[in-house]
Amino acid sequence: MGGLGGGLWGSVAAAVVILAVLGMVGLYGVFYRPALVLMTALVAVAVFVYLSFSSALGDRRFYLLGPPVIGLSAAGVALLWLGRPEGAGVVAAAYFGEPVLGYFVYRRLASIHRLWALVFLASAAAYAYSLPAVLLGLWAVPAAADLVKLAALLYFVRRV
């Protein structure tokens, strides 16, 4: 499955995994192996979502911006596997690209339902920009934003 539906389903899966990762990191820290395994899986899911949305959106800017964002996230996860704490900052920095990429998805989703598309984009931004709070033990803040994003994604999955 690819295209818009594949990208949405992949994003739903990622949102659920992210909730688990946030809880694990909040309780056990960024070097907790099960969390690292899930972070690694998230990089693979990100590649699938990127390829799916790329084919559905057909926007050159989306196509060009995805690899650096995913690559930075992969580098951060690799650093965490190596026991380097700065990997967490690299992952958080990579997620700042999510709302930028999400804007291109938003434009497509707005043709289905403008308000839910705005909820999707706003919650993606709130999640991405609050992710560094996890490093301070405030994992519930990005988790709440991720839950709202998940609700918006589920709305669209049922309509595509």
Q: PLM features: what roles do these ranges have?
A:
Residues 1-160:
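Hydrophobic, aromatic-enriched alpha-helical segments typical of multi-pass transmembrane helices
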